[in-house]
Amino acid sequence: GSDDGERIPLTICDYNREEGTVTIVFQVVGAATEMMRNYKAGDAFADFVGPLGCHSELCDENIDDLKNKKILFVAGGVGTAPVYPQVKWLHENGVDADVIIGGRNKSLIILEDQMRTVAGNLYITTDDGSYGSKGVVTNEIQKLVDAGNKYDVCIAIGPMIMMKFVCKLTKELGIHTV
């Protein structure tokens, strides 16, 4: 790593306690992430701070209560990275959650294989129809609700515009959204 690098936000997507490693997900947008693209397993950062921010509200709830809730995660693009560990944690504790992953096109759909192993049901949407259902994530939410799914809570993580429209729809549908 370089000692003169800039501070950038990174998302911890997974970890291995035994190996002492974390998996991070990032989108190449500048010099620092361009350099990181070439890192190999075992390469190190000069400095890494985190995690920052707040933990998932789900961590504060009783597992037995969560088992009785119908949970929907909606992930957009790199927003899939912070969704994965939450769904994995729920799965490890016997709680099913449905997941919608959306992206502008197939190349922006990430962590599909990993998510498939922990999600109750996984739905993929792409704006251009290059993979999964054609359209935006809100179309998929509406389809699921129209099919009789009654979600108690929705966790949406992704681009601001996606979260705005997810919250608008879930509010109309009476689904508590985080």
Where are the regions a protein language model picked out?
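Ferredoxin-reductase
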Residues: 1-41
